[in-house]
Amino acid sequence: MQLTIYPDGPSIEVADEAEALASGLEGQLVLDGARFLRRDVHGAPVGFEERPPIARALDLLPHPEGGWYRQTWRSPVEFRPDGYPGPRASATGIYFLLQPGEESVPHRVRSDEVWLWHRGGPLTLTVGDETVVLGPLVEEGQVPQAVVPGGAWQAARPAGDEAVLVSCVVSPGFDFADFST
């Protein structure tokens, strides 16, 4: 089996998935060019998963909070917001995909976050004690976007049996130093 640092880093031969998990290599790892290493929110290896077709088409990678993502934009404008440990981009954006059965684990982000629904089934977004359903059926109470205030607990999962693709725009820009579970 070939274990590679994605996208075009060095490779090593491993006997099996257990050896791949114990390899100690850093970065996004891919096994035999098809199965991607998922790490938990603390960075510990969890296992290898094949990318769903939408994730493959958009070059999404496993997100530590669950699902699949790719940063699509980071503002070149930086500043040091009050209460933050260092400078941040003024805003960032990602694609985020959740498959049926996947969830974005409960977590907090220091910055405000706007969720924007793109395609697939509806998404249940829990913000503190409230629940919002993002989706296309606005006449039925779904909304195409929702705001999570900075510091609020949040979690998300598909509301049905379809994958859901959203974007998340974070301002001040996302930094894993501002993420907690």
Region spans (language model):
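Non-catalytic, conserved peripheral segments adjacent to functional cores
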Residues: 8, 32-146, 155-156, 161-163, ...
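Structured N-terminal alpha/beta-domain signature
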Residues: 1-46
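A secondary-structure boundary/capping signal
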Residues: 149-150
